[in-house]
Amino acid sequence: MLRRAALAALLLLASGCVYYPTVMDTGGVRIRTENGRAVRQGADLLVTLDVLSTGKYGDTIVGVVSPVAKQALLVNGAGGPVNRLEIPGAATVKFTPDSTHVVLASLQRPVERGETFIVTLLFEKSGGIGVVTLLE
């Protein structure tokens, strides 16, 4: 009887010593977006945002889409097209008007100031990840 009680106590104690690995430990990809903002630039919208990669490995943006525009482009600070953008693991990449950002051209409908809409970044590994974007 004492032996069973000791074994039960030992098993109970050992069950509390469980290791739960994080995304970094397992080596996965984890991407999150935030701070989506848009401003008018002529007839187009210029979108800035932050991409947070908290996984061990990075991912690559291969495209952009949005229901408010017929054309969504990933461009560099000079306005030239960017076909692919590497997002390294364990890093934050800021999209600003002076660096890489998104341009929404040929708007499908009028977008009013204060309105929110989704811009979807298409990743090679993670698929589509939406950014809630506010027109300022």
Region spans (language model):
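C-terminal motif of bacterial Sec signal peptides marking the signal peptidase cleavage site
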Residues: L13-G16
